[in-house]
Amino acid sequence: MNKNSINYLVGKNAKLNKILSPFSQIIVFFLDDLSKTLKIINKKKHSDIEALSFFCRKNNIEKLKNNHFDSKVIRFGLGNLFHITPSNMPTNFAYSLIFGLLGGNSNIIKVPSNDFQEMKIICKSIIL
């Protein structure tokens, strides 16, 4: 694949972040801010974006952490993850991104080529 044929919706090719520990506070705060931004931007009230916004709340992420993470074991992300998401589900890429981030990883996601409004709203919210 030619690098010039890649269209970045969020982020840049040269910028991959360092690995973090799972459920890093910076990611939890980012997701909580994303939740608030999605609520504001989702003017058409897409139900799948409302569900994503609810999922990203700090309280929900803390519940996930408490139920699935042992803080006594030192863990770090593996590095860079590459996701290929289904083309018929406009918000699936966001959940894939969220779990990659919560695992402490940088993420590269191939999103559907369909022009979903929900995808645009989510990417815009991430940038804000």
Task: Say what each PLM segment does.
Residues M1-L78:
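N-terminal Rossmann-like NAD(P)+-binding subdomain of aldehyde/semialdehyde dehydrogenases
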Residues N67-I127:
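Conserved small-residue-rich beta-alpha loop and adjacent elements
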